[in-house]
Amino acid sequence: MPSLEAPSTRSRLQRMVGSVLLTCSVLLSLSACAAGKASAPQEEEFSYAWLKGYAHTLATESYVSHKGELPKSLQGMSWDDYQQFHFKKKAALWREDDSEFRAELFHLGLYFDTPVHIYQLENGKAKRIEYSPSMFDYGKSKVKGSQLPKDLGFAGFRMQFNTDWQRDVVAFLGASYFRAVGQEMQYGLSARGLAVDTALPKPEEFPMFTRFWLEKPQPGSNIATVYALLDSPSVTGAYRFDIEPGERLKMKVDAAIYPRKAIERLGVAPLTSMFMVGENDRRTGYDWRQEIHDSDGLAMHTGNGEWIWRPLGNPSNLRFNAYSDENPKGFGLLQRDRNFDHYQDDGVFYEKRPSLWIEPTGNWGKGSVQLVEIPTLDETFDNIVAFWNPAEPIQPGQELLYSYNMYWGGIPPEQSPRARVVDTFTGIGGVVGQKRKYYSKRFVIDFAGGSLPMLGKDAQVKAVISTSQGRVEIESARPQHAINGYRAMFDIVPPEDSVEPINLRVYLEVDGQPLTETWMYQWTPPPMNERELHNAGHLQ
């Protein structure tokens, strides 16, 4: 994966210049106005209410492309060259103040080629931070700061907390991407401000944070506040992030979204991760490591109270699923497997990757949690996307308000009180020692926690299995003492004439009462000519 010093983005970023078309009447404190174009002054009044008004009016104007040209010395850089750029510690924001936070800025270059405007905010006054090459150390790169334009701008920013001034707790860099860490201080999956038209038969649109306002934290406060303006051909937005580091870093997010035009698929609170190889999916299992992933499952807490665990996969073709819900209580991409032995990677430490849990504030109405799984042969490619998609059509002129909490870290703040899935294994079906006469797929799901450790030896635990097609056989549910839980096991015999995906649901019950969260899975049977029976020689 890319260095922890900067979050990765998987889009071709648009370039940004510093003006937008707005009418003079809505600029309020942004008083500089000429021919309908607004440029940010050096110091002006600022509030979140103003930012929402600014974004709302911007959405009524035609989108102005932000494309520009970087200096040649910053074009075509390698990742190693870009990593030579370091913001000087002595230039960090709030370094000389009694603050629990410091902020450093990212230099433009590589594929971070779109300047953003960054402002310091204190006591309701915003002042733009002017670029200066003296802020940066260019290391062994061939770039000479003295030859760069004085109005170059920045690519993004990152923050550190008083527990460790050398390591980031959050970073915003590229389009509307950002990342954060929990107590493990380990970057992993990313989030975005908004997703537009993901996994449709047309190019995805990547809205961009074009301006940031970094509010100076109060002395002794462990919360840092950031405001952001989002812009794209289809939508604008105003965002507020209250960032609180801890065992789980918490972000309180308020978003006001203003569509410029109808949007076919809007993604609210989008998450981006990577899954290449896991215990349940070894399609690309040629690597010496047994597991390679930033996240291993999508967790959902539905509006009706059901807890669902959906293991991720690396399909051979793009896979899209929508899980309908109303007023969801939470969803997220989690890294449940925390065992180093399962990864054996002492370079990137996948077992330390943070989970990210989204907790909606208020009612989000009807919609669906949507999951996109993209084939990948490369662990540096983020191939997993999840977000909330509202059911109501998105039309221009609307104001869409969303508030939610984001929790970054090892364990989400809220989990199912029932037993949870800890492992999912798959393989060839059938009975050991007996000749296989037809193809089947074996599924093994381990559950632990909840009330399982308290069950008596005579408890009649049953696996409740449902499938959209195919036949279930050789099913069982039995104690698994190694995890102080239970193991559900069954085979699926797919239809002979179909390679359509099969949707599976499993949970454990006793006396008709659920004991576990719901395990949900989608499996695509192979074509008939690839359904090998793998019978041993003496069983041929």
Curated annotation (Swiss-Prot):
It is found in: Periplasm. Probably involved in the control of the structural glucose backbone of osmoregulated periplasmic glucans (OPGs). Belongs to the OpgD/OpgG family. Residues 1-34 form the signal peptide. One of its GO terms (cellular component) is outer membrane-bounded periplasmic space. It comes from Shewanella oneidensis (strain ATCC 700550 / JCM 31522 / CIP 106686 / LMG 19005 / NCIMB 14063 / MR-1). The keyword Cytoplasm does not apply. InterPro entries: Gal_mutarotase_sf_dom, GH-type_carb-bd, Glucan_biosyn_MdoD, Glucan_biosyn_MdoG/MdoD, Glucan_biosyn_MdoG_C, Ig-like_fold, Ig_E-set. This is Probable glucans biosynthesis protein D. One of its GO terms (molecular function) is carbohydrate binding. HAMAP family: MdoD_OpgD. Keywords: Periplasm, Signal. Pathway: Glycan metabolism; osmoregulated periplasmic glucan (OPG) biosynthesis. One of its GO terms (biological process) is beta-glucan biosynthetic process. The lineage of its organism: Bacteria, Pseudomonadati, Pseudomonadota, Gammaproteobacteria, Alteromonadales. It holds the Pfam family MdoG. The keyword Signal applies. Its main location: periplasm.
